[in-house]
Amino acid sequence: NKALSLFKMDDHEKVIGLIQKMKRIYDSLPSGKITKETDRKIHKHFIDIALYANNKCDDRITRRVYLSKEKEVSIKVVYFINNVAVHNNTIEIPQTVNGGYDFSHLSLKGIVIKDEDLSNSNFAGCRLQNAIFQDCNMYKTNFYYAIMEKILFDNCILDDSNFAQIKMADGTLNACSAMHVQFYNAAMNRANIKNTFLDYSNFYMAYMAEVNLYKVIAPYVNLFKADLSFSKLDLINFEHADLSRVNLNKAILQNINLIDSKLFCTWLTNTFLEMVICTGSNMANVNFNNANLSNCHFNCSILTKACMFNTRLYRVNFDEASVQGMGISILRGEENIPIDSDTLVTLQKFFEEDCTSHTGMSQTEDNINAVAMKITADIMQHAD
């Protein structure tokens, strides 16, 4: 009642202070001392204050939660004003200067938003649990520092949005357009990104352990120093992408197309690679130790000083690749058989057939010296 009377005098600053005081008193009460009826009345008072504030268009107190086409709120649980619970009530927030809506620092649980225009909206610092955004336009939406748990973006436009420094667990981006999006320093554990466009997006130093990337188009994407350990990448198109210093330890890479991309000093240790096609890419100083490569091509790529120790190779093609200073050893049981990089330079194709059955190598130059041929023959004879 005091808050409402203060509103009538347009003394909004005192109202804000009063609400904060009410919240502190409410939080300090022992749970056993609050009956359901008292709890309901307290919530009703907060709602009355919020609705009155909304009529005054004072967005310092109210927050727009979900505005549908009929201008009605459709949400089950919302935390508003320092996480005070509001159940099944309408709280409408005015639009921001850019035409979006301000959800910042709200705790939103179980919301379902479909076919809405949320472009230029602000979710900075939000906590989103079991939230679903479907068929929404979220162009230039700000999720900076948001916390997301089991969130789903389905067929949404996320272009030019900001996901920097978010904390996402078990989130999904399905059939989305996420071009020019900032994901730098984002934590996206066990994220599932599929059928999505990531053109020009920035994942600088993003932590993406156990991520599943499937059918993703990612030209000019920046993954510099990102961590994708234990992740699975399948049917990915990287063109002019930067994957330098990326940690792909114990990851699975299948059907990957890398064209004119950078993988300088990238970690591919203990990684399984199948049908990875690298054309004209810079893979200098890449670490393939303990990796398993099957049907991979490194055509016209730079592998200078790359490491392939304790590595299994099956039908791997180094056609016109630069391999100076490359360190290679082939696994045979528990023994490693070294291959001199100078020998590899003389060959256009290395291991044309399965190492376990093929005992010869195609000669690409008639003048391969006898020493190189003897080393190659010995390796192939005893290769695993």
Predicted regions and their residues:
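Charged, low-complexity interaction regions
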Residues: 9-15, 30-37, 59, 359
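Amphipathic alpha-helical elements of HEAT/ARM-like alpha-solenoid repeat scaffolds that form extended
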Residues: 18-22
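Tandem repeat scaffolds
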Residues: 80-383
